């Protein structure tokens, strides 16, 4: 059996990834594929926390003329919808899963309580953190960094639509250069689109490495936790 490099991981999945090729809403084939990949690493004994974005349902910046705070709260609720969808896919595969929300909705999910989240992880349950940080003006990238620090995750697995970090958008520019390794400071100084600056700074302050990889290739999550060379690694 291959050695496991990371025992406890924080998986960040963008809302757009859940939408698949539709670009909007939830593609349950994609949700089931992601759930299958999560199950693979849970079966290895890895403890998994997850944060799902909400961009497939609502983006705060789309609310033109809308109060920013209201738009952000709508985005937080969108992440809850995605979290419940992913929970359903995981539980259909017999993976014990809990959703914890930063905004209380007790009939739907548990409130975020750090000690309870840690206990779930220790028992082998997947914990999906929804509702952002519970505060407007903070992205789900920042949520992932914050929760990763709180649960003492070994790494953040940043699953995206591209297979790593580039100096410019590889979908638009054929000459885009991919980075294999970056430091936190390089990401901040070059303004590379890994995570937003708040999230990157939080990871830097708590020395949490970030692995950026493409979600469209099956088996990438497993490869990442086993320490195989994949995507881009951001660290000290």
Curated annotation (Swiss-Prot):
Described function? Catalyzes the reversible phosphorylation of UMP to UDP.
List the HAMAP family hit by this protein, alphabetically: PyrH_B
Cellular localisation: Cytoplasm
> What family is this protein classified in?
Belongs to the UMP kinase family.
Question: Record keywords: Transit peptide included?
Answer: no
The entry summarizes how activity is regulated as: Allosterically activated by GTP. Inhibited by UTP.
Listed binding positions for ATP are: 12-15, 55, 59, 166, 169
Record-listed E.C. numbers: 2.7.4.22
Q: Outline the subunit composition.
A: Homohexamer.
* PANTHER family per record: URIDYLATE KINASE (PTHR42833), URIDYLATE KINASE PUMPKIN, CHLOROPLASTIC (PTHR42833:SF4)
Designated name of the protein: Uridylate kinase
Please give the pathway this protein is involved in.
Answer: Pyrimidine metabolism; CTP biosynthesis via de novo pathway; UDP from UMP (UMPK route): step 1/1
Q: Name one GO cellular component term.
A: cytoplasm
One GO BP: UDP biosynthetic process
Instruction: Name the gene for this chain.
Output: pyrH
């Amino acid at each position: 059996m291959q050695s496991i490099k990371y025992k406890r991981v924080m998986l960040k999945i963008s809302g757009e990834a859940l939408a698949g090729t539709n670009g909007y809403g939830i593609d349950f084939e994609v949700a089931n594929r992601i759930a299958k990949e999560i199950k693979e690493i849970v079966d290895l004994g890895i403890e998994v926390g997850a944060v799902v974005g909400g961009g497939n349902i609502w983006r705060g910046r789309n609310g033109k003329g809308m109060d920013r705070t209201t738009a952000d709260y709508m985005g937080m609720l969108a992440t809850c919808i995605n979290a419940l969808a992913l929970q359903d896919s995981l539980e259909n595969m017999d993976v014990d899963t809990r959703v914890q929300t930063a905004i209380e909705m007790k009939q739907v999910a548990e409130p975020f309580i750090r000690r309870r989240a840690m206990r779930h992880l220790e028992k082998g349950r997947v914990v999906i953190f929804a509702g952002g940080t519970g505060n407007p003006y903070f992205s789900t990238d920042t949520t992932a960094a914050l929760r990763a620090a709180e649960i003492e995750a070994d790494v953040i697995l940043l699953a995206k639509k591209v297979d790593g970090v580039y100096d410019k958008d590889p979908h638009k520019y054929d000459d885009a250069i991919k980075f294999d390794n970056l430091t936190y400071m390089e990401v901040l100084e070059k303004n590379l689109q890994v995570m937003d600056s708040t999230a990157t700074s939080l990871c830097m302050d708590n020395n949490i490495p970030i692995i950026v990889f493409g979600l469209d290739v099956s088996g990438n999550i497993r490869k990442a936790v086993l320490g195989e060379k994949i995507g881009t690694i951001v660290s000290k």
